Regions:
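Conserved N-terminal diphosphate/IPP-binding helix and adjacent helical/loop segment
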Residues: 2-145, 149, 155, 161-164, ...
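Acidic, Mg2+-coordinating active-site segments of isoprenoid diphosphate-utilizing enzymes
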Residues: 58-66, 130, 154-177, 186, ...
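Amphipathic alpha-helical interaction segments
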Residues: 104-107, 210, 214, 254, ...
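Solvent-exposed loop and edge beta-strand segments that line ligand/cofactor-binding
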Residues: 112-118, 179-183, 248-249, 328
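Alpha-helical scaffolds flanking conserved acidic
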Residues: 135-146, 172, 209-214, 273-284
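Transmembrane helix-loop-helix
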Residues: 201-214, 343
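Flexible, glycine/charged-enriched surface loops at secondary-structure junctions
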Residues: 294-297, 346-354
Length: 365
């Protein structure tokens, strides 16, 4: 093992010269990003039949760096600060529930909503608001709401009738920790609480109504729920590239896209600005899912906090399954570059959104 962290190796080229074979090896970190390339020479000492005794193997070059770039480090620092604010808001929303909410339901909601996670969607909402001159404070209700929708979707996705998962964010899933009925109700409750949070947290009624409409459409039958329905259907009937994109654009991409648009709404964005945020969100939503598919193939449960390898076991449509690992990684990078270019017109204020887009392909979980 060279350097720190887990790596995997891939033979990417091979050339022979006389009795010496040179093998180019590319090493990847657990985040599916190239860490280094090096050459190994394998010299056969004689022309006789090869055996384990007649080879000399030499490692010529090794260079590994697992340190995050300055750009990524800056984003992660800001991310940590905003996550604290988001978690405080989420905790407050749960604590404000009256005694009419049963204790077991409240605890199941809290267990899932406040479990350790990236808070990627609410952070994206807040960064979207800031990119257009708004404040994270004014966008916080929308940010909390989108995390509630995301948490509700995870609770339901993990159920035995859906993806049948027992591990989420490094902890037992909600239906394992409590029971199936409580998990279903906790998901239902978080969905309802999301819209209540938007309506009670936005002082401008117009922004509140528009925000509810965006989130409802993204989470509903034409968005996340529709994508999940097609995903389950594809496990039985199969599908191709068109179905793959249709599933992920809705199941994962729709809520990510809505997150940044909700930030724009909180910042009183113009229709043109909202359209650019929508395109940006669509691009990084697809990139995010591609990387998720790659992590399921190449990472570990300890690293991702959820069971890996399950997509191939269930016969799910995935980008690596159709395009292969290398082509999938290239596609993710292309979508990220498209996302970055679309927010260029926002000027210096778009820096955080650009950093966020690059993080999508750099992440390890």
């Amino acid at each position: 093992m060279w350097g720190s962290g887990s790596v995997r190796c891939q033979n990417v080229a091979q050339a022979s010269c006389s009795l010496t074979t040179f093998i180019a090896v590319k090493v990847y970190n657990t985040n599916a990003r190239p860490a280094c390339e090096f050459w190994i020479s394998v010299k056969q000492n004689s022309a006789r039949t090869p055996s384990t005794e007649c080879f000399e193997t030499n490692l010529h070059t090794v260079q590994i760096s697992n340190e995050p770039s300055n750009e990524t480090a800056a984003l992660l620092s800001r991310w940590k600060s905003l996550t604290t604010e988001v978690d405080s808001k989420l905790e407050n929303c749960i604590e404000k529930l009256s005694k009419r909410c049963p204790d077991v339901l409240r605890e199941a909601m809290r267990y899932s909503l406040l479990s350790p996670g990236k808070r990627l969607r609410p952070i994206l909402c807040l960064l979207g608001a800031e990119a257009l001159g708004g404040s994270s404070f004014n966008a916080m209700a929308n940010a909390a709401a989108v995390e509630m929708i995301h948490s509700y979707s995870l609770i339901h996705d993990d159920l035995p009738a859906m993806d049948d998962d027992d591990l989420r964010r490094g902890r037992p899933t909600c239906h394992i920790q409590f029971d199936e009925a409580t998990a279903i109700l906790a998901g239902d409750a978080l969905q309802a609480l999301a819209f209540e949070t938007i309506l009670s947290g936005n002082t401008d009624p117009s922004i509140a109504v528009k925000s509810c409409l965006v989130l409802a459409k993204a989470a509903g039958p034409e968005g996340m729920v529709g994508g999940q329905s097609d995903d389950l259907r594809a496990e039985k009937l199969g599908g191709g590239v068109e179905m793959l994109h249709a599933i992920h654009a809705r199941k994962t991409g729709a809520i990510i896209q809505a997150s940044v648009v909700l930030g724009g709404l909180a910042a009183n964005a113009t229709p043109e600005e909202l359209e650019k945020l929508s395109i940006y969100g669509d691009c990084i939503g697809i990139a995010f899912q591609i990387v998720d598919d790659l992590l399921d193939v190449e990472s570990t449960s300890e690293n991702t906090g959820k069971r890996t390898g399950k997509d191939s076991e269930r016969g799910k449509l995935t980008f690596p399954g159709i395009f292969g690992v290398r082509a999938s990684r290239d596609r993710a990078a292309e979508f990220v570059e498209q996302a970055i270019s679309i927010v260029d017109s926002f000027g210096p204020a778009s820096t955080s959104l650009k950093q966020f887009a690059r993080y999508i392909t750099d992440r390890s979980h």
